[in-house]
Amino acid sequence: MATYQVRLINKKRNLDITLPVDEDTTVLEAAEEAELDLPFSCHSGACSSCVGKVVEGEINQDDQTFLDEEQVAKGFVLLCVTYPRTDCTIRTHQEAYLV
């Protein structure tokens, strides 16, 4: 099983941490295991509480049902159903930027 280095960043919240995330673990699950306080609600990809934005790297979020194609194309991801496929950097707390 592959493990990737996922960097979570947010300047406003003074957040910059890199977590090892297994390919079959969501980014939110890994963050919770590391006791990070990230927003979430449904844990099923059906809301926008845990939205982040991929700055670098590749992910899989095929299970999400909330984001539209344009939002996905802009790099928005739902951390509760986001699985890393490479080392990546994700900006957290991006719900206010969904338009």
UniProtKB/Swiss-Prot annotation:
Coiled coil: none annotated. Ferredoxins are iron-sulfur proteins that transfer electrons in a wide variety of metabolic reactions. Donates electrons to the nitrogenase. NCBIfam families: fdx_plant (TIGR02008). It comes from the Bacteria. SUPFAM superfamilies: 2Fe-2S ferredoxin-like. Keywords: 2Fe-2S, Electron transport, Iron, Iron-sulfur, Metal-binding, Nitrogen fixation, Transport. GO terms for biological process: electron transport chain; nitrogen fixation. Pfam families: Fer2. This is Ferredoxin-2. Belongs to the 2Fe2S plant-type ferredoxin family. InterPro entries: 2Fe-2S_ferredoxin-like_sf, 2Fe-2S_ferredoxin-type, 2Fe2S_fd_BS, Beta-grasp_dom_sf, Fd_pln. Binds 1 [2Fe-2S] cluster. The keyword Magnesium does not apply. [2Fe-2S] cluster binds at C42, C47, C50, C80. Its cofactor is [2Fe-2S] cluster. GO terms for molecular function: 2 iron, 2 sulfur cluster binding; electron transfer activity; metal ion binding. Residues 4-96 form the 2Fe-2S ferredoxin-type domain.
